[in-house]
Amino acid sequence: MAEEQAYHVSKGLECIKALRENPPNMEEIQEVSNIRDQTYKSSKESGTTGVQEEEITQNIDESHTPTKRSNSVSDVLQEDQRGREDNTAPVEAKDRIEEDTQTGPAVRRYYVYDHCGEKVKGIEDADSLMVPAGPPSNRGFEGREGSLDDSIEDSSEDYSEGNASSNWGYTFGLNPDRAADVSMLMEEELTALLGTGHNAGGQKRDGRTLQFPNSPEGSIGNQACEPIKKGTGEKLASHGMMTAAGLTNGATRSAPKSTGGSSGPNASAGSVPQSVTTAKMIQKCKTESGTRPQPEKPNEIESDGEYDDELFSEIQEIRSAITKLTEDNQSILSKLDTLLLLKGEIDSIKKQISKQNIAISTIEGHLSSIMIAIPGFGKDTGDPTANVDINPDVRPIIGRDSGRALAEVLKKPASSRGNQKDGGLILGSKGQLLKDLQLKPIDKNSSSAIGFKPKDSAPSKAVIASLIRSSKVDQSHKQNMLSLLKNIKGDDNLNEFYQMIKSISHI
């Protein structure tokens, strides 16, 4: 955009300075104005205003050199600037034209002059051109050959909502006291031609469209919004696509024209395709300088509508598929939560089983190392359990049976119980033990594992006191019995007291 603005400003300054050198005739200006008014009226009646506007513009701007343009509006400048002090020095336009023509048809170079007629130096790139809004003496413009692809009508559409100075980024405020100020020209047509493009950028006024002059290389601004499919066939620069493509859908944007000059011979090249195979592209061609947008065809509108319907249906299908996937994921997650709970319960059960196994193994270890004392000798013959083994797997303690374990010690069968009673043992006999080493049989009148026989002794009284405390008698009766127990003396009295306690407590 900066390059285009600098280009138009430099061209306008050239035209103004050239008009001072060769003032035009007022008759020619009046003739051109009459022709344009007549053509405008006829085109308004026939409904072909757009086509006639282009013809009018071409009639006005049919010359491309600054010297020929000066023949059409110089009298207006001369009349408007009478009585005004001329503060600017003349510029030799002929020298600049000779320098421009020496660069060749492919590359055209413009130079920037201030209002004093001096060339501005140090500006090499048009993109870095800054046009200040200060005094006219500090202003400089640099014009390079820029692409006419971006039209003034496009810029008016983009910046019509705000003011021109703030939206365009550059201020072209000229001092109205200077003779070269374009905005102070009093003639209506010249103001519409130059002042409108400077301030509004090509807005339509009174049914007329402002058209800027074509490039000195040739008329390339009247091309339609269609790409060049083939090369030029000659060593000329291919201008490519003359529209700025706006994409609403699709992927590929048209490539702009390269503004740099080529060092070698130029090769033929085609434009970038407007569409790709994987995505449909809707391209909106913006109006360029000297061009009109082509009307959309009905079949294209219908195809766009069908494409939108298909796209909407596909989006709906994708949305339903995503919803189904979400529901499936939710059900799967709920089942996973249940599985996690079951896994925790299974782990707790496994821990309990392992604890039970440890307890069982501990009990088994204790049972293998302990022998329970079940007497097998000393019972009365009238006892029904005398000859019955309660638990044959549990062995009695060694010593309850006389002569038990002698076979393991002497490696011979032990003596029977009858032989022990009838015949005596020979001391020192082979295979027999001394009598003193043998255990005595259980005394029926003394306390043993087969029964409690109370005696007037402290252990017997302690056993009876324990029986009283564990009984279900009232606490007051327990205290009375314990006090009586302390005063009892003698085996018979203690045995009688024991029998009474057994009857009371149902032992």
UniProtKB/Swiss-Prot annotation:
Q: Could you tell me which residues belong to the region Disordered?
A: 30-106, 128-163, 248-306
The domain of life for this entry's organism is Viruses
* Bias-annotated ranges (Basic and acidic residues): 79-99, 285-300
Q: Which keywords annotate this record?
A: Coiled coil, Phosphoprotein, Viral RNA replication
A biological-process GO annotation: DNA-templated transcription
Q: Which stretches does the entry tag as region Multimerization?
A: 304-376
InterPro entries this protein is in? P/V_Pprotein_paramyxoviral (IPR004897), Paramyxo_P/V_N (IPR028243), RNA_pol_Pprot-P_XD_paramyxovir (IPR016075)
Bias kind Acidic residues: ranges: 148-160
Q: Name one GO molecular function term.
A: RNA binding
Q: Which CDD domains match?
A: MEV_P-protein-C_like
Q: Where is this region: Interaction with the nucleocapsid (N-RNA)?
A: 459-507
Tell me if Chaperone is a UniProt keyword of this record.
no
Consult the record and explain the modifications the protein receives after translation.
Answer: Phosphorylation on serines by host CK2 is necessary for the formation of viral factories.
Q: What is known of its domains?
A: The N-terminus consists of a long intrinsically disordered tail. The central part contains the coiled-coil multimerization domain (PMD). Forms a four-stranded coiled coil structure. The C-terminus constitutes the alpha-helical domain that binds to the nucleocapsid (N-RNA complex).
Subunit relationships? Homotetramer. Interacts (via multimerization domain) with polymerase L; this interaction forms the polymerase L-P complex. Interacts (via N-terminus) with N0 (via Ncore); this interaction allows P to chaperon N0 to avoid N polymerization before encapsidation. Interacts (via C-terminus) with N-RNA template; this interaction positions the polymerase on the template for both transcription and replication.
Family of this protein = Belongs to the morbillivirus P protein family.
Query: Per its database record, what is this protein's job?
Result: Essential cofactor of the RNA polymerase L that plays a central role in the transcription and replication by forming the polymerase complex with RNA polymerase L and recruiting L to the genomic N-RNA template for RNA synthesis. Also plays a central role in the encapsidation of nascent RNA chains by forming the encapsidation complex with the nucleocapsid protein N (N-P complex). Acts as a chaperone for newly synthesized free N protein, so-called N0, allowing encapsidation of nascent RNA chains during replication.
Q: What is this protein called?
A: Phosphoprotein
Q: Which organism is it from?
A: Phocine distemper virus (PDV)
From which lineage does this chain's organism come? Viruses, Riboviria, Orthornavirae, Negarnaviricota, Haploviricotina
